[in-house]
């Protein structure tokens, strides 16, 4: 309890001194009416040194402060429970530098009497103002691009990750509908909130099913059927939603082959195009006749096989010209039986 009480008293002391320092540096009167820029933008070295002694080296966290001397945001170490300073460089530039009131500078001296055009962030946009050349504050940029870089206007909520409910409903799918681009059953379904169903699947054999619409405050109609291939009939649309239940889908009719276009006639020759070249027709060649068996050659081969190779003619031992077991057996039976 003593440790927590000491930390609470130290926090009150640090906050009080921070408000006094901010009031001395031009942040306005310290009190409950100070804004975020006057409370946490300016660097206070005495407070930082005391926070380092009380928090310890391991309990310091990075914080970003705006420096009037450097005219930019810098990083300092602060105690983790101190509410002074910004948590990021972007927040420091946006809250500390860009939210300062536009200033035309201070006069005095030859160098401070010239008038130059500078860009200043006023009312969520960058505008041109006259600047004397001396004094002023951080809300002073040489070019419009530099001003927009540091002081970019805040984006809408749905650009920061929060999508409106209507947009989210339009992008959702129906429970009954299934994604299909090939023609089988299953087109895009209706979205939650009663939006009209999208068309069914494209082309294919049977038409796609239309998605059934959900119950909602707007249109309760199912999606249209998918288109057929080559001009075929499309599928039927889904039923509208009723009550809290999704509408039932209806199967589309079968696609029919559309009529094919007639072949256009060949163009006539003109002076510019010249004669129309046509392909040369192919010449039909007759098929070759099959070779017939020559009986004379067959008898001659048999005689050569049976006839012996010795000079003794038919009386000696015969040796066939080529070996054929069947023919050799017949020759042996005929000659030596």
Curated annotation (Swiss-Prot):
Annotated Gene3D superfamilies: Pancreatic trypsin inhibitor Kunitz domain
Q: Which InterPro entries match?
A: Kunitz_BPTI (IPR002223), Kunitz_BPTI_sf (IPR036880), TFPI/VKTCI-like (IPR050098)
Every BPTI/Kunitz inhibitor domain range: 98-151
**How far does the signal peptide extend, from start to end residue?**
1-18
Chief location of this protein within or outside the cell: secreted
Q: Name one GO cellular component term.
A: extracellular space
Q: What is this protein called?
A: BPTI/Kunitz domain-containing protein 2
Which source organism? Pinctada maxima
Q: What is the lineage of its organism?
A: Eukaryota, Metazoa, Spiralia, Lophotrochozoa, Mollusca
